[in-house]
């Protein structure tokens, strides 16, 4: 599972544009795939909910 680091948490975890590009175009992940997101030393297991041209919507599944 791929791990990414969020830069902000305002209702949703916010990833860098380069991470979004990596998820969509390099890893070719699809809706429903799981990723690990770290924010404030907490690990979240997240499911990809939808893609927009410049954003990625994820649902937080598990907080570890």
Predicted regions and their residues:
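N-terminal positively charged helical leader segments and presequences
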Residues: 1-64
């Amino acid at each position: 599972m791929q791990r990414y680091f969020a830069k902000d948490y305002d209702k949703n975890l916010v990833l860098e544009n380069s991470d979004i590009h990596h998820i969509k175009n390099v890893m070719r992940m699809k809706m429903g795939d799981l990723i690990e997101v770290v924010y404030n030393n907490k690990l979240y297991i997240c499911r990809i909910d939808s893609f927009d041209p410049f954003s990625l919507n994820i649902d937080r599944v598990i907080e570890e």
